[in-house]
Amino acid sequence: MTKDLLVELGLEELPAYVVTPSEKQLVQRMADFLKDNRLSYDAIEGFSTPRRLAVRVLGLADQQTDLTEDFKGPSKKIALDADGQFSKAAQGFVRGKGLTVDDIEFREVKGEEYVYVTKHEAGKQAKGVLAAVPEVLASLTFPVSMHWANNSFDYIRPVHSLIVLLDDEPLELDFLDIHSGRISRGHRFLGEETSITSADSYEADLRSQFVIASAKERQEMIIAQIRAIEAEQKVQVDIDEDLLNEVLNLVEYPTAFMGSFDPKYLEIPEEVLVTSMKNHQRYFVVRDQAGKLMPNFISVRNGNAKHLQNVIKGNEKVLVARLEDGEFFWREDQKLFIEDLVAKLAHVTFHEKIGSLAEHMDRTKVIAAFLADQAGLSEAEKSAVARAAQIYKFDLLTGMVGEFDELQGIMGEKYALLAGEAAAVATAIREHYLPDSAEGELPETKVGAVLALADKLDTLLSFFSVGLIPSGSNDPYALRRATQGIVRILEHFGWSIPMDKLIDSLYELSFESLTYQHKAEVLDFICARVDKMMGSAIPKDIREAVLASSSFVVPELLARAEALAAASQLDTYKPAVESLSRVFNLAKKAVDAVLIDASLFENDYERALAQAVDSLVLSGSAKEQLAQVFALSPVIDDFFDHTMVMTEDEAIRCNRLALLAELVKKVETIAAFDRLNTK
């Protein structure tokens, strides 16, 4: 016999960004709890609103499955004493399992007999097991937490109610200072407290009190309502996924509506309008059929359609205040001069341990010039890089960016163009922030990409130099994101800049304002980002082997990892890697000062390998280079089959080791083949 279980936790208003993750976490924790406690079920589903988290288990067994476990004990020779009686070791073993020596049997394992006992445990009633549901609730973790009243226990928000129903039967449980019942809260303004009749009536009972318990249903309602407005008004609405997910977790009973604002505000840059509506007011942007921004917005009310005109007017009033600010800053900022703003950056702190923004920009300018040469930019592009690096942070001191910090770089581009700067310079000012997330948009121009690289490199090296190195999940200065951006930009543009040599060069610049330190840690940190970019689809041993190669060129590292992963599926992979691994292992014994002496070769197999090594010049794609290396496998095997490398003759031994070391030197630019796993 099965029943349905409902668990609902009523809370104070939750931050929108934690609602969905908390629902998923509750579902997973409950599923794990049921599995660990041998309670089978048909399905499990989650519910959430800003004021509740809930989970429903369908078809829950009314009793645990019985448990039968075998336990292996000491060997027979230890379990029996000289008189053939059970020893203290055997007696202690069975006592620890709650059994007696009468339960012992002997089983043979690999030619020797051991004590075994079988323990049978009857399944408990589900009700008794579910008494631990509060422990499941207590196990939830949150990005922020608080405590209230006299509770010493921290939680995301104060708890107001707890419901635990098994079909229609409430279970008597306590969580913190709350005793469970069947009372849930309806909508804050439209509903009342309501009694949940049974687990399967949960959604209907809440709906009667203007609460849509299913996040998926609220999302579908919002989308349908927006689409209806689109059709009626003949407009297009940007349904931003992130904004949609936030809005649906701000409301329990959604009603979408369209508001408007004075068309005069359309003279402000579109980015300012969109930021004001989307980021600050949680409004959806409205466009005409041609995609042009309209003086309208879509918002979602937490309630029904009653008195909607009053709600619309209130939302319009709040937005106009924001747009007034935007219009004011747009007008006033155009009175400022770029050079004056740049000069003031000397008084703006980049970080108290590192220096000012002006010093950061000075270093970035030097790095950008160096990178522009390395990346092969044209003279015109180099000139644009130099100018952009000289001014690229000026917009941080504008009124607009002070009010809307999301627009840094974006407003820099616009103000730079208005001031007569070249388009390439203005674009680079915007693009230097890219990518702004792990999968974010990349710079499109080489000038912007070089400036972005330079800015991120100085940021990385600067923070490492003063010991502000990320540890664990702690990364307050977003250095992982910056480094991931460095790796992605290099890969996207295919710039073959050796990172180890680049970092060496930057350290040699020895800036007066900051001396770079922690070089090894910086390279390891970059390696970790490359490893992450390779992804779990590339086997771990291949990632490690490639990252341990002697060539640290990001696009090539990624290409070689993919080439090796593809090659690992071929029959030729295992023998080739095993041959190369043997070469690598023996080459470690080579004496550095010894040069190869052809006169010391004793057989044709040595000469053949020497000729192959001498003529080996890796070229072409990563796949082609790997094929060149793997083609040496027969020559290497013949060499080992007919040549004793570690011969007693020291001169010959050192000569052969020098030959293998030369081969390693040439092929380790692809990977450290001795790190590859062929088992």
From Swiss-Prot:
Chief localisation class: cytoplasm
GO molecular function terms listed in the Swiss-Prot or TrEMBL record: ATP binding; glycine-tRNA ligase activity
UniProt catalytic activity: tRNA(Gly) + glycine + ATP = glycyl-tRNA(Gly) + AMP + diphosphate
Keyword Protein biosynthesis appears in the UniProt entry: yes
Record keywords: Aminoacyl-tRNA synthetase, ATP-binding, Cytoplasm, Ligase, Nucleotide-binding, Protein biosynthesis
One CC-aspect GO term: cytosol
Transferase among keywords: no
Pfam short name (any one): tRNA_synt_2f
EC identifiers of the protein: 6.1.1.14
GO biological process: glycyl-tRNA aminoacylation
Top-rank EC class of the record's enzyme: ligase
SUPFAM superfamilies per the UniProt record, alphabetical: HD-domain/PDEase-like (SSF109604)
Localization of this protein: Cytoplasm
Classification via PROSITE patterns: AA_TRNA_LIGASE_II_GLYAB
Subunit details: Tetramer of two alpha and two beta subunits.
Family the entry assigns: Belongs to the class-II aminoacyl-tRNA synthetase family.
HAMAP family to which the protein is assigned, alphabetical: Gly_tRNA_synth_beta
Matches recorded under PANTHER family: GLYCINE--TRNA LIGASE, CHLOROPLASTIC_MITOCHONDRIAL 2 (PTHR30075:SF2), GLYCYL-TRNA SYNTHETASE (PTHR30075)
Descriptive protein name: Glycine--tRNA ligase beta subunit
Originating organism: Streptococcus equi subsp. zooepidemicus (strain H70)
Gene giving rise to this polypeptide: glyS
